[in-house]
Amino acid sequence: MYYINSPLDQFEMNTLLKFVTPFFDMSNLNITTFGLYIIIVLMVIVSLNILTTNNNTIIGSRWNLPLEMIYDTILNTTKGQIGGKLWGLYFPLIYTLFMFILIANLISLIPYSFALTAQIVFVISLSFIIWLGSTITGFNKHGWLFFSLFVPNGTPTPLVPLLVIIESLSYIARAFSLGLRLTCNILAGHLLMVILGGLLLNFININKLTLILGIIPFAMILAILCLEFAIAMIQSYVFATLTASYIKDSLYLH
């Protein structure tokens, strides 16, 4: 049985259920905290969409409003970023990415839960796949002309080699910066909450006076928690927007 002994355990991946046989190595089928929370996030996303669209009514209930607002926001963002006739082709991808990261971020704010988006290997792998997919899309559409993306219009000929190097490094950095930005923000926020929460707990346990005075730092922690909710939503939107921007660059070379 797996027990959580510290808030920092939300960053650790532990095995919850092992599959052991005397004949085959089934360790790849073990259920870990990572796999469990992936399933939870996907179930929440599917449940939300089923519950809000299952009534088949023209005028939705007030419970439909938040999801419809999210849908319209991502729709307009994708249309504004990618534009043209191809934006609708990539909208399901952008919307799914946004919802997945948003739900994962919000679930990670629950005390003692597992922080999916604080797993740097997972998030950077996801951003690398997005970068690689957009690069392949650009090559498939433009062929060798895709490399013109690394030469800004109007660049003086003597500066072309230098700018090609700079633009190439900048483009390659996208594969990691997209995920690193998300992971660092989530990880920093969670660590701050853990540190402040531990200090507050030690402070209020000193005596009765500190127990009363602890209301002030407790209110500050609640304010930081509200800020973490905002960061969770903002980082989800930033990830989705940058993904759409990378796809646009591959499609239109600008």
Swiss-Prot record:
| Alphabetic keyword roster | ATP synthesis, CF(0), Hydrogen ion transport, Ion transport, Membrane, Mitochondrion, Mitochondrion inner membrane, Transmembrane, Transmembrane helix, Transport
Q: Where is this gene product found?
A: Mitochondrion inner membrane
Mind listing the GO molecular function terms for this protein? proton-transporting ATP synthase activity, rotational mechanism
Propeptide regions on this chain? 1-5
Q: Which regions span the lipid bilayer?
A: 31-51, 87-107, 113-133, 146-166, 186-206, 211-231
Query: Could you tell me which Gene3D superfamilies the record lists for this protein?
Result: ATP synthase, F0 complex, subunit A
Q: What domain of life does the UniProt record list for this protein's source?
A: Eukaryota
Q: Does the keyword Transmembrane helix apply?
A: yes
Physiological role: Mitochondrial membrane ATP synthase (F(1)F(0) ATP synthase or Complex V) produces ATP from ADP in the presence of a proton gradient across the membrane which is generated by electron transport complexes of the respiratory chain. F-type ATPases consist of two structural domains, F(1) - containing the extramembraneous catalytic core and F(0) - containing the membrane proton channel, linked together by a central stalk and a peripheral stalk. During catalysis, ATP synthesis in the catalytic domain of F(1) is coupled via a rotary mechanism of the central stalk subunits to proton translocation.
> What family does the entry list?
Belongs to the ATPase A chain family.
What assembly does the database describe for this protein?
F-type ATPases have 2 components, CF(1) - the catalytic core - and CF(0) - the membrane proton channel. CF(1) has five subunits: alpha(3), beta(3), gamma(1), delta(1), epsilon(1). CF(0) has three main subunits: a, b and c.
Q: What is this protein called?
A: ATP synthase subunit a
Q: Which organism is it from?
A: Vanderwaltozyma polyspora (strain ATCC 22028 / DSM 70294 / BCRC 21397 / CBS 2163 / NBRC 10782 / NRRL Y-8283 / UCD 57-17) (Kluyveromyces polysporus)
Lineage, uppermost ranks: Eukaryota, Fungi, Dikarya, Ascomycota, Saccharomycotina
